[in-house]
Amino acid sequence: MDAVRLEAVTKRFNTLTAVEKLSFSIPEGKVFGLLGPNGAGKTTTLRMLMRVLIPDEGSIEVLGTPADDRTPDAIGYLPEERGLYPRMKIREVLVFLAALKGLTEAEADRGARQWLERLELGEWVNKKINDLSKGMQQKVQFIAAVLHRPPILILDEPFTGLDPVNAALIKDIMLELRDQGSTIILSTHRMEQVEMMCDSICLIDHGRPILAGELKAIKRSFGKNTVRIEYTGNGQFLDLPHVVERLNRHGAAVDVKLRPGANAQEILKAAVADGVEITRFELVEPPLNDIFIEKVSSTNA
């Protein structure tokens, strides 16, 4: 069964069409990436799922039934904007928010303490929200989203403010929840996280879908037009404008997107001529970041 299904959903604000005829479905127990540039309509879409906004056209189904006022109880929502009461203590905030989702105080208190320990905040249980760093507040907000054990999670930029260690911790918990049957809708600008976590994606721009489907199939469809290179020495051998369209450096490697019809062997020849030691030279599928840029750029051309 699909956990979520949108059919031709449209939302307007006066003369502005924020979302137009958007359709996608998310099977239960999967991680789905809702992607797009700033202002694309992602947050409006998430708010329609949460019934904060009502579509002007189209339909939304959640867990096999039309969305209604009970739908938010089945969803844990981590918004991009902070939604915590700054003068309340962590425990008080979590118990209060969990009670709104139907948990008893005892259930909420027990669950809150367990999650706080899991996220290394156990000693902060009686601290006020405004005493916490941004990263710590983000972890509390994540707990608020998962505390009532919802079957569906909507996480809008969940890694904001987190250092690499805590980002990895949240990622591992998200995958653990997925393995336990939760459906996760992830909205983020961090394409590397999408590649590691998402089963399928929908890329929207100006409120319209421009790319959707299983992530692996999408990457295959773009072909192996990228060379991943690891080398020691000067990188001037990559200054080949007739061959190289774009460079994407990460760590010790560089991804080189080839121009249409270009021969990757020209890069290798240039490296040898410059005396550069190549330790990796491999044709790979393009990273999602490159696909994102290409599709959005072509839409706005």
Predicted region positions:
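Short, Lys/Arg-enriched, disordered terminal segments
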Residues: M1-D2, N300-A301
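ABC transporter nucleotide-binding domains
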Residues: D2-V4, K11-D205, L211
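Alpha-helix N-cap/helix-start and coil->helix boundary motif
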Residues: T10, D68, R91, M191, ...
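Short, well-ordered coil loops that connect the C-terminus of an alpha-helix to the N-terminus
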Residues: T15, L103, L121, K224, ...
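Residues that scaffold the ATP/ADP-binding catalytic core of kinase and kinase-like folds
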Residues: R70, A145, I218, I291, ...
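Generic structural signal for individual residues within well-ordered alpha-helical segments
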Residues: L94, D109, L116, A168, ...
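ABC transporter nucleotide-binding domain
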Residues: K171-L258
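Short, charged/small-residue-rich alpha-helical element at the C-terminal edge
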Residues: T226-K295, A301
